[in-house]
A protein has these predicted regions:
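PLP-dependent amino-acid enzyme catalytic core
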Residues: 1-288
Length: 288
């Protein structure tokens, strides 16, 4: 995996640290997002007083699979199990629940994993640059939300065929929106626009297909949450057979590598939308 922080700019690092201090922003470590029980109690007491989607920097600590919606604090990873009466198979099928992340999707974590290294290394200067979040879905929402919490200007680049509710929410949290032709499968048009923007030094493109922080965050945070869930629910005769991930930017599926480290015989399986089976047969089309 490429280095998350290949080089440092100490002048911008100092500026970013001063900016965070001035706005009361504390950056959670990846370890704290893996194990939020290790967050200092003083911060936990403040966190439980705010809403999950509030534009409060403390919600950076809620970028975890372990949000407890009853207490406002943290517990075990949120999961569900499909009973054999519904699945029709004897194998136990368990899924993690992502709706209890801020923004309702774990892509907010992938976005944090991409932006955090740039901030702490001085590769991104929010005083002079805008963070650009290209996506057909939840990644640009997560990135814009993270940027709002971190007092960083955000630009969401997404297809014009997405829902008006999505556009309205992005505007509400202060993101600039650039629309490209098409809908879910029109990824090329998004990155054509990003290529155009990349020639302007005032834009920093956070492409989750390229940023190693996407896979790194999912390997550490999603992978450990999956393993912890398996350890919690397994019975003596159970073994971890397979991990299934719907694919897009190949971020979430990196959690499978964590599981293979813990249980080498685990299979990693990629799922694709039937209307757009890109890997299976170069499929292209709109999907839900």
């Amino acid at each position: 995996m490429p280095k998350l922080i290949p080089h440092k700019n100490m002048d911008i690092i100092r500026k970013n640290a001063a900016r965070c201090k001035a706005h009361g922003i504390i950056l959670p470590t990846i370890s704290q997002q893996m194990n939020p029980h290790n967050i200092p109690l003083e911060l936990q007491n403040r966190i439980k007083e705010i809403g999950l989607w509030d534009l409060n920097p403390l919600n950076l600590f809620r970028i975890t699979w372990k949000n407890d919606m009853e207490t406002g604090l943290f517990g075990a990873p949120n999961y569900f199990e499909i009973p054999p009466e519904i699945s029709g198979v004897r194998a136990r099928i368990v899924g993690l629940v992502g709706k209890y992340f801020p923004t309702g999707a774990h892509k907010v974590g992938a976005a944090y994993g991409c932006l955090l290294p740039l901030l702490v290394s001085g590769a991104f200067d929010p005083e002079t640059q805008k963070s650009v979040w290209p996506s057909t879905g939840n990644y640009c929402r997560g990135g814009a939300f993270d940027a709002a919490l971190l007092d960083c200007p955000a630009v969401a680049v997404l297809p014009e065929g997405m829902s008006e509710e999505r556009f309205a929410w992005l505007r509400e949290i202060g993101a600039e929106i650039i629309l490209t032709p098409g809908s879910e499968s029109n990824v090329k048009e998004i990155y054509d626009k990003c290529e155009e923007l990349s020639h302007d030094p005032h834009y920093t493109i956070l492409n989750h297909f390229e940023e190693p922080g996407n896979s790194f965050w999912n390997y550490q945070v999603t992978g450990s949450a999956l393993w912890e869930t398996f350890q919690h629910i397994k019975k003596p005769a159970n073994r971890l057979s397979a991990f299934v991930s719907a694919t897009g930017s190949a971020g979430t599926i990196a959690a499978g590598d964590y599981l293979k480290k813990m249980s080498p015989h685990t299979m990693i399986t990629a799922a694709e939308a039937m209307e757009c089976p890109t890997m299976l047969n170069n499929g292209f089309g709109e999907h839900r």
